[in-house]
């Protein structure tokens, strides 16, 4: 057929990759919510959800049915348009962040030359969603949680970006595939250990996960900026949080742990195993650490993480210049 051109085939393949990645990431985020509850039950010496299906295997289906039939309520004095847009922006920005992650040598939705910058841009866009949610709800707790979240996210995104500059300098590229190929013989976690530590801490903070979940602290703010949300709007925030965890875990693997590289097993399997390990670490951190005060979180970022990233960047630059001579 004359209308089937190589460009059309490439477009169709790109759409297919995007749809597959969308389904896989959303499914992983949904299953992680169930897995987290089961593992937290194990860590805390209790049962966890085990009533629906064999061993709780159908709990996720029950949660989805319940969420679909929840009343989609909008507060009377809220800004209805912005209130509705906020969860959509949050979910979309977190999902788009995964588009730049190379799952295997030939499987990446968007192989951008500005891949890391695109991720930082999407992470910044999520701040607007949180601010929209807090302001449009017309609720003091919601607004206070949104202000906490925006201040925390903007602060830790500085450390998040600086922690990646050493990796970019070593690879000589912002392209994620180039960064993975540069780790064929030595993972970046060895020369960039302090960069990895800072990225891991900042990644947890940007995802608003325990112990950096002050924006939605139940004891203080009654669930923070999404206190007024219900039904599918709340579901978008809820699943979006777990998609953020999947994305940050995948980025840790891609940037510091060799991506798909590994012996014997296929590339995709190695990538999936490494990503699952870091997703487990998110759950273990939640089960293990207490929640600090909000001022302690901000102080830790500016007084510990920022100097650590700057020292790591200066040492990396000095080593690269020394090797070039």
Curated annotation (Swiss-Prot):
Keyword Transmembrane helix: yes
Function of the protein: NDH-1 shuttles electrons from NADH, via FMN and iron-sulfur (Fe-S) centers, to quinones in the respiratory chain. The immediate electron acceptor for the enzyme in this species is believed to be ubiquinone. Couples the redox reaction to proton translocation (for every two electrons transferred, four hydrogen ions are translocated across the cytoplasmic membrane), and thus conserves the redox energy in a proton gradient. This subunit may bind ubiquinone.
GO cellular component: plasma membrane
NCBIfam families named among the record's database cross-references: PRK06076.1-1, PRK06076.1-2
Protein name: NADH-quinone oxidoreductase subunit H
Organism superkingdom: Bacteria
Encoding gene, per UniProt annotation: nuoH
Subcellular location: Cell inner membrane
Transmembrane portions of the chain: 11-31, 50-69, 81-101, 114-134, 154-174, 186-206, 237-257, 265-285, 304-324
Biological process, per Gene Ontology: aerobic respiration
EC number from the UniProt entry: 7.1.1.-
Family: Belongs to the complex I subunit 1 family.
Protein's UniProt keywords contain NAD: yes
PROSITE patterns: COMPLEX1_ND1_1, COMPLEX1_ND1_2
Self-association and partners: NDH-1 is composed of 13 different subunits. Subunits NuoA, H, J, K, L, M, N constitute the membrane sector of the complex.
Reactions mediated catalytically: a quinone + NADH + 5 H(+)(in) = a quinol + NAD(+) + 4 H(+)(out)
Xref: InterPro entries: NADH_UbQ_OxRdtase_su1/FPO, NADH_UbQ_OxRdtase_su1_CS
Keywords: Cell inner membrane, Cell membrane, Membrane, NAD, Quinone, Translocase, Transmembrane, Transmembrane helix, Ubiquinone
Membrane topology: Multi-pass membrane protein
Species the sequence originates in: Salmonella arizonae (strain ATCC BAA-731 / CDC346-86 / RSK2980)
MF terms in GO: NADH dehydrogenase activity; oxidoreductase activity, acting on NAD(P)H, quinone or similar compound as acceptor; quinone binding
């Amino acid at each position: 057929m004359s209308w089937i051109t190589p460009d059309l085939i490439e477009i169709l393949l790109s759409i297919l990759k995007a749809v597959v990645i969308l389904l896989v990431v959303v499914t992983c985020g949904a299953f992680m919510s169930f897995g987290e509850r089961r593992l937290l039950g194990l860590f805390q010496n209790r049962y966890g959800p085990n009533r629906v299906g064999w061993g709780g295997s159908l709990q996720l289906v029950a949660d989805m049915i319940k969420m679909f039939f929840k009343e989609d309520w909008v507060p009377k004095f809220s800004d209805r348009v912005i209130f509705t847009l906020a969860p959509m922006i949050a979910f979309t920005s977190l999902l788009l962040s995964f588009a730049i992650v190379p799952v295997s040598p030939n499987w990446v939705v968007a192989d951008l030359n500005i891949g890391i910058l695109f991720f930082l841009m999407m992470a910044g866009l999520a701040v607007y969603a949180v601010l929209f949610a807090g302001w449009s709800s017309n609720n003091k707790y919601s607004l206070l949680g949104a202000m906490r979240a925006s201040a925390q996210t903007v602060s830790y995104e500085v450390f998040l970006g600086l922690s990646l500059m050493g990796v970019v300098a070593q690879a000589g590229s912002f392209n994620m595939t180039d960064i993975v190929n540069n780790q064929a013989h030595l993972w970046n976690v060895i020369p960039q250990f302090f960069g990895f530590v800072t990225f891991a801490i900042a990644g947890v903070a940007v995802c608003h996960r325990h112990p950096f979940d002050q924006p939605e602290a139940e004891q203080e703010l009654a669930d923070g900026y999404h206190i007024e949300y219900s039904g599918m709007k709340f579901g978008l925030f809820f699943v979006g949080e777990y998609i953020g965890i999947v994305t940050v875990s995948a980025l840790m693997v891609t940037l510091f742990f060799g991506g798909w590289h590994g012996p014997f097993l296929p590339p995709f399997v190695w990538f999936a195993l490494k990503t699952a390990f870091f997703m487990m670490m998110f759950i273990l951190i939640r089960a293990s650490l207490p929640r600090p005060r909000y001022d302690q979180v901000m102080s830790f970022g500016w007084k510990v993480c920022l100097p650590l990233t700057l020292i790591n960047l200066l040492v990396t630059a000095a080593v690269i210049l020394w090797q070039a001579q």
